[in-house]
């Protein structure tokens, strides 16, 4: 399962190894199941006798699963933190939850900062450095926090929300106690957030129609066996989020349909840091004439100018590459400020493989298979939290470590406190008539945007409040009913929509 949608480009590493004829490879991971280990070994031609497992069990980590209703979570969080010493991490699912929980803890007088992918990279770096130095004691974070974090004295990790899988759970608690001193890993668990983690999965599965559109785009835009891609525009057109779009492209690569060649920036704009004459003064002859021509055939809006590459080729015979080199040279000499955007990736295309009538369906089946496996992993996580035998032992066995003690003595189950997870309150549905009305309104709205057919998945994503390119582009989130079933599991919403809309 490694690579899919997390680091899809990882899936290409075995091919790179073969292409570059690399004789030896070393794969390192802390959280691979037996099946994943075999899969990785097979892809990299690693023999079974060359697989080494050093053990997963960590006796200094105390694992506790607490069944806590949503309304009681904040109080339990404070109580749990007050019982700890030193610094720690509180993991949440959503960006807004990170800020909400951090604000709550700050009001209680704790040294805390939120951290999530919505922050600018400079701010994330500053928060991380403050935590590493001890200036900040607690980080409330989404899974965006953790990669590359190696702070030895993290004394506690608390999951305020459900993790996404046993793999995620183990990676996140694995950041505690790296100095081998006792550390506590606490999960405040109920089933209220189950729909949220499941919806992340459902929202990333492309529809067959979207995959088919991508294939048709390659067929129509391919010239001389080359295809140029601007990721955001194709993502919008196909209604496929950018991360699964990247996964789709990787799968097309692995099947030999496309092969990456190079990339370039489609749009350039520049502004002078001095006068135009002072920019031209250091140059003579043809070089000066060439630069003057670039400036002449640049469309300026106030201070920024965009070179017209077609006009430059027509009037001066220069190709795009020479213009870019000249602009980059001027920027290096601090004579202009140059900005680039719209990175364009260029692929070679195997038209024979691209024309396979089963290509789109096979790719869609791949994504659906991954979706089903991800949902099963979430269910496995819930079952793990509800176990009545040692958590440490079962966690180690999950990762193929058969040598962990049967009863660790430092988990909530070994202390006789096994749990049964429940919903904090009954799920409240909008009535069927209301669902029919808001979906009818969605269909009417999209018909004005030249979208005559609204799929079942589009309706379900609308009701559950999932953001997809189609909604952002057509202002769908402003419609009444968007997210009206956001607290309900996606599969249940799908069944309801099929019945109400007679699909």
Predicted regions and their residues:
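Helicase motor core with emphasis on the C-terminal RecA-like subdomain
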Residues: 1-281, 285-286
């Amino acid at each position: 399962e490694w690579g899919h949608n997390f680091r899809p480009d990882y899936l290409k590493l075995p091919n790179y190894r073969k292409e570059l004829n690399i004789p030896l490879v070393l794969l390192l991971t802390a959280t691979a199941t037996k099946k994943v280990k075999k899969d990785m070994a097979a892809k990299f031609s690693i023999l079974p006798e060359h697989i080494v497992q050093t053990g997963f069990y960590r006796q200094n980590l105390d694992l506790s699963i607490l069944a806590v209703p949503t309304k009681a979570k904040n109080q339990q969080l404070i109580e749990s933190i007050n019982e700890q010493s030193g610094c720690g991490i509180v993991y949440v699912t959503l960006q807004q939850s990170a800020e909400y929980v951090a604000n709550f803890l700050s009001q209680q007088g704790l040294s805390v900062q939120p951290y999530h992918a919505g922050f600018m990279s400079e701010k994330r770096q500053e928060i991380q450095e403050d935590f590493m130095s001890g200036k900040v004691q607690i980080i409330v974070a989404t899974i965006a926090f953790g990669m590359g974090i190696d702070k030895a004295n993290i004394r506690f990790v608390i999951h305020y929300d459900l993790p996404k899988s046993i793999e995620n759970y183990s990676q996140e608690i694995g950041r505690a106690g790296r100095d081998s001193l006792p550390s506590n890993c606490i999960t405040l668990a109920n089933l209220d957030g189950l729909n949220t983690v499941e919806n992340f999965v459902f929202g990333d599965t492309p529809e067959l129609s979207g995959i088919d559109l991508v294939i048709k785009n390659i067929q129509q835009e391919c010239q001389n066996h080359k295809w140029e891609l601007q990721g955001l525009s194709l993502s919008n057109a196909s209604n496929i989020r950018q991360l699964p779009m990247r996964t789709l492209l990787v799968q097309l690569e692995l099947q030999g349909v496309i092969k990456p060649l190079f990339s370039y920036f489609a749009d350039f704009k520049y502004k002078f840091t001095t006068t135009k004459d002072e920019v031209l003064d250091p140059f003579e002859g043809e070089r000066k004439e060439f630069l003057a021509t670039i400036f002449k055939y640049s469309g300026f809006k106030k201070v920024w100018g965009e070179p017209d590459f077609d006009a430059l080729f027509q009037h001066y015979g220069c190709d795009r590459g020479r213009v870019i080199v000249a602009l980059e040279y001027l920027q290096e000499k601090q004579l202009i400020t140059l900005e680039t955007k719209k990175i364009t990736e260029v692929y070679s295309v195997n038209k024979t493989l691209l024309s396979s009538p089963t290509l789109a369906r096979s790719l869609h089946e791949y994504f659906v298979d991954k979706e089903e496996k991800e949902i099963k992993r979430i269910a496995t996580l819930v079952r793990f939290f509800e176990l009545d035998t040692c958590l440490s032992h079962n966690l180690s066995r999950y990762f193929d470590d058969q040598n962990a003690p049967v009863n660790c003595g430092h988990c909530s189950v070994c202390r006789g406190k096994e749990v049964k997870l429940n919903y904090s309150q009954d799920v409240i549905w909008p009535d069927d008539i209301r669902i029919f009305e808001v979906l009818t309104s969605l269909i009417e709205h999209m018909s004005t945007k030249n979208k005559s057919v609204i799929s079942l998945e589009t309706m379900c994503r609308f009701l559950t409040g999932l953001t997809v390119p189609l909604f952002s582009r057509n202002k769908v989130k402003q419609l009444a009913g968007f997210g009206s079933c956001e607290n309900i599991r996606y599969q249940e919403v799908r069944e309801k929509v099929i019945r109400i809309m007679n699909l």
